């Protein structure tokens, strides 16, 4: 008899099941734990002053966001943005902080906020479209931060940051409407990936990797190539699954299926087996990410300008994936 399709996760079905995330760092050959230290004290003081002003004037949270949350975000960005110089790191830090606040404090509650429908639409449009930024103060401030990236990246790469941001906002808001979610207990990983990779911020990996490269950019023909998209797929899959793995404990009592471990748990009738399978997928996608880089670099060995550009971008991407792994592993936000 075929298993009944489910659209919700019910923890009662897995009562008394014990589970544990096994250590697997040694199997991620190529990952290195690094966090910036050079200008950390200076940045941290500026950062806390900025978060205070944002809370008071823009988010109107009046200091209700615990200081430890900002400390966690600061540490998280220290891992992921380790390759950045001082000034672009400041912008990356503000951008990531604002994104997490939007995700955790605004998008998470957007359907329950005491806002009229047209006010919600203005807020969303102000975050997605530059020409609508004046419709909402939050959107205006967000665009002020995004525009600072222009000082540290090529104009073509900057446009890709904007595109990734718009896609993330749309996907992040849409994913919270469980009743319209096409994700169900029979989803394969690729089906799940298609629905979740954008709202999980995966599109930022390769765009952020281009920050700091002012004099060159990756041509669209390369970006759109099968070889490049394969790298992008494995990087985004790694990010999505790492996020699912280390946020599962926090999300276990929520009944949505916005975590692949929940889908696997229903399929396998075991949380532990679903965690083990997720770890296998993480390792597989990371190793394929590395091998796919080798494949595309071989294609451009006779074009040193493109070769060196791609090599730099992929080195930055690998540092970002390393940061994602160690930040998730150690952060209280994901445990």
Curated annotation (Swiss-Prot):
It comes from the Eukaryota. A motif (NDxxSxxxD/E motif) lies at residues 243-251. This is Terpene synthase 4. It catalyses: (2E,6E)-farnesyl diphosphate + H2O = (6E)-nerolidol + diphosphate. Belongs to the terpene synthase family. InterPro entries: Isoprenoid_synthase_dom_sf. Terpene synthase that converts its substrate farnesyl diphosphate (FPP) into the sesquiterpene (E)-nerolidol. Induction: Expression is almost undetectable in vegetatively growing cells and increases during development induced by starvation. Expression is highest during he ultimate stage of mature fruiting body (approximately 24 hours after induction). The lineage of its organism: Eukaryota, Amoebozoa, Evosea, Eumycetozoa, Dictyostelia. The gene is TPS4. It is an enzyme of class 4 (lyase).
